[in-house]
């Protein structure tokens, strides 16, 4: 096999893997429904470009109809290349809206010099995007957070916030008017990096505001990347844990009635299981290779009727 042919094969596997990961997340959490109008938040980074690209692929083949509109918030950061996103979106024929709001000056005026601006900037941006979604008549807001973002948020909240809380794949917006979805919830960041290189997206740098990166998030990110390198399968195991929560073996009295626990009561997940050695597979699969010797993680899900976004459009007469 030639080097070129091998690379093409790898590229096809990557595209298929991403498409199926996004499709699985959409199916598992019922993210997209018939006639949805989805506002895809496009920052100019690799994640949001990939999100839009994969949703367009699914839109072309899915058995349901839904609309996509790309929205970028131009926050008037110094050096922001205003022409990049409109040029790209027009070239691929995607409806879009550029919202111009000078949040950069607001943040700089409110915060002291040298302080991390990300938190305040994020709150301002969220409010503007909610307003824009309402103006456009969108039923869903799609964000580009991926699996690594979700795990990083879990550890940030555990280490620095004292909460067992991550980033939900689907939620109701703060104002209660919109459903926010994260179709990249099952996607690995390293796959998104490869995909951006493959597709040659016109990436816009994320540090134009000059803000220092969040040190805590950087530490967590480095930790996860180190674990992924040294302990294959650990990241997959941790993400699986988010989908297999056992409240009776934690310590939150709001989630489980410890006070009302009585003798003879049968627990769904067993009572003393935490004291026994758990049977764990020697190796977890991350889904990147088709290897029958690996044990793939399949979280238990309740049966429910949802539309399979990965299915094909129904054939029409004469097709």
Curated annotation (Swiss-Prot):
Q: Which family does it belong to?
A: Belongs to the TtcA family.
**Which Gene Ontology BP annotations are present?**
tRNA thio-modification
Protein location: Cytoplasm
Which ranges belong to the motif PP-loop motif? 43-48
Tell whether 4Fe-4S is among the UniProt keywords: yes
Q: Which HAMAP family did the record assign?
A: TtcA (MF_01850)
Free-text comment on the cofactor: Binds 1 [4Fe-4S] cluster per subunit. The cluster is chelated by three Cys residues, the fourth Fe has a free coordination site that may bind a sulfur atom transferred from the persulfide of IscS.
Q: Reaction catalysed?
A: cytidine(32) in tRNA + S-sulfanyl-L-cysteinyl-[cysteine desulfurase] + AH2 + ATP = 2-thiocytidine(32) in tRNA + L-cysteinyl-[cysteine desulfurase] + A + AMP + diphosphate + H(+)
Which keywords does this chain's UniProt record carry? 4Fe-4S, ATP-binding, Cytoplasm, Iron, Iron-sulfur, Magnesium, Metal-binding, Nucleotide-binding, RNA-binding, Transferase, tRNA processing, tRNA-binding
In the record, what terms sit under GO molecular function? 4 iron, 4 sulfur cluster binding; ATP binding; magnesium ion binding; sulfurtransferase activity; tRNA binding
Pathway it acts in? Answer: tRNA modification
Q: Name one Pfam family in it.
A: ATP_bind_3
Q: Which organism is it from?
A: Neisseria meningitidis serogroup B (strain ATCC BAA-335 / MC58)
Q: Which cofactor does it need?
A: Mg(2+); [4Fe-4S] cluster
Q: What is its EC number?
A: 2.8.1.-
Record field: transmembrane: none
- The answer to keyword Glycosyltransferase applying to this record is no
Any one annotated GO CC term: cytosol
What is the role of the protein in this entry? Catalyzes the ATP-dependent 2-thiolation of cytidine in position 32 of tRNA, to form 2-thiocytidine (s(2)C32). The sulfur atoms are provided by the cysteine/cysteine desulfurase (IscS) system.
| Binding, [4Fe-4S] cluster | 118, 121, 209
- InterPro entries this protein is in? Rossmann-like_a/b/a_fold (IPR014729), TilS/TtcA_N (IPR011063), tRNA_Cyd_32_2_STrfase (IPR012089), tRNA_thiolation_TtcA_Ctu1 (IPR035107)
What protein name does the entry list? tRNA-cytidine(32) 2-sulfurtransferase
The annotated subunit structure for this chain is: Homodimer.
């Amino acid at each position: 096999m030639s080097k070129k042919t091998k690379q093409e094969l790898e590229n096809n596997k990557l595209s298929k893997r991403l498409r199926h990961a996004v499709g699985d997340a959409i199916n598992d959490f019922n993210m997209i429904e018939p006639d949805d109008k989805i506002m895809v938040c496009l920052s100019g980074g690799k994640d949001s470009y990939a999100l839009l690209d994969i949703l367009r692929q699914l839109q072309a083949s899915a058995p349901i109809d839904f609309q996509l509109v790309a929205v970028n918030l131009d926050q008037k950061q110094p050096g922001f290349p205003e022409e990049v996103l409109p040029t790209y979106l027009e070239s691929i024929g995607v409806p879009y809206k550029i919202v111009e709001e000078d949040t950069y000056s607001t943040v700089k005026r409110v915060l002291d010099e040298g302080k991390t601006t990300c938190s305040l900037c994020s709150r301002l941006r969220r409010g503007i995007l909610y307003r824009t979604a309402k103006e456009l008549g969108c039923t869903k807001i799609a964000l580009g957070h991926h699996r690594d973002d979700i795990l990083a948020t879990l550890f940030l909240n555990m280490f620095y916030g004292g909460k067992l809380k991550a980033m939900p794949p689907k939620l109701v917006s703060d104002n209660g008017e919109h459903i926010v979805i994260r179709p990249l919830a099952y996607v690995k960041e390293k796959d998104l990096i490869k995909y951006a290189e493959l597709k040659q997206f016109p990436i816009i740098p994320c540090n134009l505001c000059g803000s220092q990166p969040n040190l805590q998030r950087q530490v967590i990110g480095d930790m996860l990347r180190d674990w992924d390198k040294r302990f294959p399968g650990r990241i997959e195991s941790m993400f699986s844990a988010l989908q297999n929560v056992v409240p009776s073996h934690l310590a939150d009295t709001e989630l489980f009635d410890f006070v009302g626990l009585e003798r003879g009561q049968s627990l769904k997940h067993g009572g003393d299981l935490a004291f026994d050695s758990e049977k764990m597979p020697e190796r977890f699969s991350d889904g990147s290779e088709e290897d029958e010797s690996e044990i793939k993680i399949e979280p238990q899900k309740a049966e429910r009727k949802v539309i399979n976004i990965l299915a094909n459009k129904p054939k029409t007469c004469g097709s």
